[in-house]
Every structure is written in C-alpha cells, then in structure tokens.
C-alpha cells in the first residue's frame, strides 16, 4: 500500500480530514527547501505538495508564478527537486510527497528516467497540471509501475466523461479545483463545491482534496466539511515570501498547526 493510501486510510479510520500544504521547491532559498518541508510536517501536514518550478505556469496565479520565477532564478530544476525529496526522506519516511508541476520538465528529463529517479528518491505522487487525463493512460501506467500515484485535477467545468476518465487512471487522491481561474483566487463558494463532490465520488473511488482560494483556518474548516482533504498553496508561498528568514520555518509550522486544529474540529463535531 502506498504512503498516500496509508495516510488517507489512517485519516478515515480516525474520522479526520487531510491537510495538504503546497510550497514551491527552491523558494525563497533552495538551501532551505527540506527544512521548510519538515516545518510543514511538524505543523500537521498529512501530504506535502512540492511545486516544480516552471517558466510558464499557466494554472497558477501571480503569487505562485512569482515564486516559480524566483526558484528558477536560483537555478532550481526538476533534478534539484527530486534531490530535495531524497534528503527529506533521510529523516521523514512517513509523510507523502507529491510533485506538482508541468509536463515540460518531465518530458525533457524523459518519463522513464523521471519515474526511476522519483521512485528512488521517495516521491509518492505526481500531479502534472497540463496533462489531460484522456491522453494520460500510458503516463499513469508508467507512474504506477514505479509505485508513484498519478494525481489529476478536476474542476467545476469537468464533464462526467472526464471525471470517469480520471476514475480509470488516477490513484492516491484527486485534486478538485474549487474555482474557475488560477490559484490564489478568491470568492470560494462552499455550497457549489458540496454540490459537485457527489458526482466525483460516484465515478472516482479516491479521496477528494479541494484547493484554490483557501487562505485561512476558517475557510479550510468550511471546505473540510464537504471534502476529504484541503489543499493550501498560495497562502503558504506568501507566508514564506513575507516572513523574516529566521522566523520562516516557525511561521509555517504555526500556520499549518492552526489549520490542522480547525480541520480536527470538523472530525470532533461529527
């Protein structure tokens, strides 16, 4: 059983909701990426999404775009990100790590070489934003053969056919994009999210994580009421950008712990 599957099985057994923070590898300081990953885990992250910097991150809002640009300016590549996961695994063998990014860096490295290196480093899942599920059966199979969960995005505009396609090839969890547009946008409508989840659940036998537009513990709690997990990205990246260097890790841990407490109150209330 994969680390991701184990994690969600344990959460389900405890009646808890998953917390999935996102950070861009290499930003603000490539030398501290692993430290910040540990800070997220210390705060109560169930899964860590680690962003692979890319020059044209079309699905990301300005906060994550700029974060990606800063990481690229530091020379951070896909190989560096995989090396960060390997170092993280030296002292954390339990928290799943999902690489999130775009097709270009993987294709340049070669899918087979990527799968091999990612597996050896201890990567648990990969979410390629610009890979449509209809064209991804081979990629998904290659990842699963390497013990890596292929994770896919679904959106308010996803058709029943696309949802069913994801259900056939995805593993680990699915990431439901709660808003049309880019990451970091505002105006979350929890009732709209709640209305879409049953259609996903009926076709995809996996936990559903919801992200885009979740900026604080209160919003995270509301979203957790109707989902299996909450994904927070832009706010984490912003906190790292704004924090004094000496306080950055502690700031992350404190914020994640606040959200963790809010999510656990959902479980307690049930």
UniProtKB/Swiss-Prot annotation:
GO terms for molecular function: tryptophan synthase activity. It catalyses: (1S,2R)-1-C-(indol-3-yl)glycerol 3-phosphate + L-serine = D-glyceraldehyde 3-phosphate + L-tryptophan + H2O. Keywords: Amino-acid biosynthesis, Aromatic amino acid biosynthesis, Lyase, Tryptophan biosynthesis. It is an enzyme of class 4 (lyase). PROSITE patterns: TRP_SYNTHASE_ALPHA. Its EC number is 4.2.1.20. Pathway: Amino-acid biosynthesis; L-tryptophan biosynthesis; L-tryptophan from chorismate: step 5/5. It holds the Pfam family Trp_syntA. Coiled coil: none annotated. The active site is at residues 49, 60. GO terms for cellular component: cytosol. The alpha subunit is responsible for the aldol cleavage of indoleglycerol phosphate to indole and glyceraldehyde 3-phosphate. Belongs to the TrpA family. Tetramer of two alpha and two beta chains. NCBIfam families: trpA. HAMAP family: Trp_synth_alpha. This is Tryptophan synthase alpha chain. It comes from Paraburkholderia phytofirmans (strain DSM 17436 / LMG 22146 / PsJN) (Burkholderia phytofirmans). The lineage of its organism: Bacteria, Pseudomonadati, Pseudomonadota, Betaproteobacteria, Burkholderiales.
